[in-house]
Amino acid sequence: MKKGIELFKSEIYTGKKTTEFEKTVGLKLPVLFKYFCEMFELGQECFLNAKRSFDDILLPITSVNYVDLKENINLRISHFYELKELQSRWKEDIEFSEWFKTRNLLPIAYEEINLGQIFISLSQNDFGNIWYIGGYENDKPIYLSKNIFEFASKLVETEINDEDFKNKQVYKNWGEDFWRVKE
């Protein structure tokens, strides 16, 4: 199973995505977060987690979790938001409400179990720190890490319990990047 940054699809660094985002949205991003956004593919398919073919659809057989055993935190991360998506939604989406903007929290990833979000702080006193806020009204911010790479280092690939197949029943054909289930 993969862990840390080996879970991400890499991209060629250009520096253009973050520069355009900062100009359009009017926010200054932390340097390490800029590198992260430029080095790795973001969006719905950002992770290299294992998938299987099911009726011509690729379904994940593993999930990506943020795990901090010391703090007893385990969050299933669905995906990281693409900068273009954030850029277009920042000023108009209720999901990115004034509450987050006034606290200088930029949503960067979606947590799928509690419908929460992972945020990066843009405020001076904790610039670049990573926080989690659950999807419920009274959920309080939870500190996760001091920067995006420390956060990414705690990501691990874990198996999804699926009654349709057992792991011993899967195989890959040469050149395929997904698993097939033996019939």
Feature locations, PLM:
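Short acidic/polar mixed-charge low-complexity motifs
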Residues: 114-116, 138
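Acidic, proline/glycine-rich low-complexity IDRs
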Residues: 150-183
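A short alpha->loop->secondary-structure connector
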Residues: 127
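A broad, low-specificity signal marking well-ordered, structured residues that form hydrophobic/aromatic
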Residues: 105-106, 118, 131, 142
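Short, surface-exposed beta-strand/loop micro-motifs that present aromatic residues
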Residues: 116-123
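Structured loops at beta-to-helix junctions and adjacent beta-edge loops in soluble globular domains
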Residues: 109-111, 123, 133-135
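Compact, glycine/acidic-enriched structural inserts
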Residues: 131-162
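A surface-exposed partner-binding patch
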Residues: 1-113, 179-183
